[in-house]
Amino acid sequence: NSSTQNVGDIAVDWKSGTIWVGTGENNSSRSSYAGIGILKSTDKGKTWTNVGLLDSHHIGRILINPNNPDEVIVGSIGHLYSSNKERGVFKTTDGGKTWKKTLFIDENTGIIDIQPVPNNFNILYAAAWERESKAWNVDGDGKNSAIYKSTDAGNTWTKISDNNGFPNGKGVGRIGLAVYDENTVYAFHDNQFRRKKDSTKSAKGSGALTKEELASISVDEFLNMKDKKLNSYLKMNGLQEKYRAENVKQIIRSSPGEMRPSDLVGYLKDANAALFDTPVIGAEVFKTTDGGKTWKKTHEGHLDDLYYSYGYYFGEIRVDPQDQNGIYVLGVPILKSKDGGKTFTSISKENVHADHQALWVNPKKQGHLIDGNDGGLNISYDDGESWIKLNEPAVGQFYTVYADNQENYKVYGGMQDNGVWVGNHNAKIDKSWHQTGKNPYESLMGGDGMQVAVDDRNPNIVYTGYQFGNYYRI
């Protein structure tokens, strides 16, 4: 019953039934909302108490010492849109009555992840993240993004990612951590440095759209181009978040005789020149086998189609507790590796939503996974070869709800990454549609579903859209 719906992390002491909740989302998107500090329940969630860190705004991680439930470590990311001091690593040894800041980098750098060594809470690894958001841009990298290590349960920290194989400098982005043992650690890095020109794979000869082709084709050829081909081109150049084939084509349609596909090259280039010509390196996995003394990239080449240009929205990695070479990385798809990150395969399936945010790997049964994504929850018992969709929890995030003015009115909802849906006002959801295939709600559009308006003169005309101002009449 607290005055927030935004959660960054949860930690539970199962023996005592004590639950710790770090409020404020840890994904630094434009729609990521601040929280109200740390909440604690000592009666399995019946009642809650705020135990401080109110100005942290966004919590990256909470860890409970399994041998002392009053000892808790918190990673605070800090404000998203401004600088502040209540960020870094905080520790309590009295159940949240008092807090001590044990690691502080600066007012723009917080802690996005902390992971303990299994069975040794004294050794902790933490990921610092320098980031700042504006209404018009997310800056998700900085020279203070780095990896730290503690050998005294979080009381003191040492940076372990300087000039030892891990990237340094202004292009270091969000980092996720997975710890197998005290020496073996994986780091999942959103590398925002630009790719070298000669390292960007050429699309020539592959049937993919090129800048040269785009500059020479006619308007009719462009409008008849398959959306998949154009969307692949936009993704390859890091523009997937802002542009889709539909709205790029609409730009051409809306200016007959005035704008050609060749103009689009310059238009997109001006919109984001650096990303257009030299995409960022993007997602990459590093590994240490000596407790952070040295780091080495696990794979050759780029992990394309995993992060695109918005790695600040992801950053989670897991290692199989029974197999140090079994790792999982989460992005738009979910990938797994069985050879320590040398090669990866996608385990995203047709009934699994994109954009993966959380993953539980059963420490006692290999192949048993629970995946949390922007479409809800999925469970697998065969290491991601097949998934069951858990569609019962009401976990949708609505941006808007709208009702038209008919007597037998319809209700519309725009949802985060689940599009726009409509149903009759008296529609009831039960499990019968699993048998009949007739869901009382209908999807009108994908993406981030936004505002809806219905023409009062003709309720069959609906105006709606998705993120970045892309609106349509249906």
Residue ranges and their predicted role:
Residues 1-474:
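Beta-propeller blade termini and top-face loops
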